[in-house]
Amino acid sequence: NIYYAGVAESGGEFGVYSGSGTVLXXLPLTF
C-alpha cells in the first residue's frame, strides 16, 4: 500500500509514514 504524510491509504491512521509503513513522526492533519 502507498503511504504518505497525512493519512494512510489503508487504515486511516494519521501521521507521517515511509514507503515501508514506518511512522516517522506523529503529525495529525485535518482532511
Swiss-Prot record:
It catalyses: Endohydrolysis of (1->4)-beta-D-glucosidic linkages in cellulose, lichenin and cereal beta-D-glucans. Keywords: Carbohydrate metabolism, Cellulose degradation, Glycosidase, Hydrolase, Polysaccharide degradation. GO terms for molecular function: cellulase activity. The keyword Hydrolase applies. It comes from the Eukaryota. GO terms for biological process: cellulose catabolic process. This is Endoglucanase 2. Active towards carboxymethyl cellulose. Its EC number is 3.2.1.4.
